[in-house]
From Swiss-Prot:
The keyword Cytoplasm applies. Its main location: cytoplasm. Keywords: Cell cycle, Cell division, Chromosome partition, Cytoplasm. It comes from Bacillus velezensis (strain DSM 23117 / BGSC 10A6 / LMG 26770 / FZB42) (Bacillus amyloliquefaciens subsp. plantarum). The lineage of its organism: Bacteria, Bacillati, Bacillota, Bacilli, Bacillales. It is found in: Cytoplasm. This is Segregation and condensation protein A.
Length: 251
């Protein structure tokens, strides 16, 4: 496959990914099941590497940290007791990570509040619509859907890969096709226009060839970044749907 890297602002670092997993899995941040969160984290990082996304070294450092915490949590009781005399009080191996996550969550919440206030100030200089009923209805419908992040998209892509591996027949000959990202983007836009409706994310992956799967996913990320598509998800872990934005339907 042609080497291609996608850099998107959504990738804010390993703490952001961990917080995403905690929220999506509805985990108590003060009592993190390390084995579960480590497994999910490593799966995401592996998928990001397969997609040739720009995975910073800090993601790998966090992976090592999680594995270290996991191993300490699995220490037999007898081994734990050997260290008790050297410690003033028993420490939870997760404490430092939990503290960092709580601080990061505060920072992220504050940043979100500042952004919302800035958007509100910008709206104050525009003329509001005379009839707000339709506008209010639209907002209400939008709020019923989750805010879909790139991490959600990676999770959905993981499911696609798993299904393709299960259904993929044995092949004696492998044909390698290099597909430009731009061409796949145009094909997706054309499909959305032809369908005239929102389509399921999985419908974009008819091929079983890994190169085609990866290029398709990268094309979706680019369309997201360019605001050419709208991503919707009704609830955690449910299907993701894609709709063309006004920019492509008006073209």
């Amino acid at each position: 496959m042609v080497e291609y890297q996608v850099k998107i602002d959504t990738f804010e670092g390993p703490l952001d990914l961990l917080l995403h997993l905690i929220n999506r899995l509805e985990i108590d941040i003060y009592d993190i099941p390390v084995a579960t969160i480590t497994e999910q984290y490593l799966l995401y990082v592996h998928t990001m590497q397969e997609l040739e996304l720009d995975v910073a070294s800090e993601y790998l450092v966090m992976a090592a940290t999680l594995l270290s915490i996991k191993s300490r949590m699995l220490l037999p009781k007898q081994e734990e007791e050997l260290f008790e005399d050297e410690m003033l009080e028993e420490e939870d191996p997760r404490d430092e990570l939990i503290e960092k996550l709580i601080e990061y969550r505060k920072y992220k919440t504050a940043a979100k509040d500042l952004k919302e206030r800035e958007e509100e100030r910008q709206k104050s200089f525009t003329k509001p619509p005379s009839d707000l009923s339709e506008y209010a209805k639209e907002i209400k419908q939008t709020e019923q859907k989750l805010s879909v992040t790139v991490y959600d998209m990676i999770g959905a892509f993981q499911k696609v890969l798993q299904r393709k591996k299960i259904t993929r027949p044995k092949e004696t000959t492998i044909t390698r096709q290099e597909i430009p990202i731009e061409d796949r983007m145009n094909e997706i836009v054309k499909s959305l226009k032809t369908a005239g409706r929102r389509i399921n994310f999985t419908e974009l992956f008819p091929s079983r060839q890994k190169d085609h799967l990866v290029v398709t996913f990268l094309a979706v990320l680019e369309l997201m970044k360019n605001q050419q598509i709208i991503i919707e998800q009704e609830e955690n872990f449910s299907d993701i749907y894609i709709t063309g934005s006004e920019s492509i339907h008006g073209a």
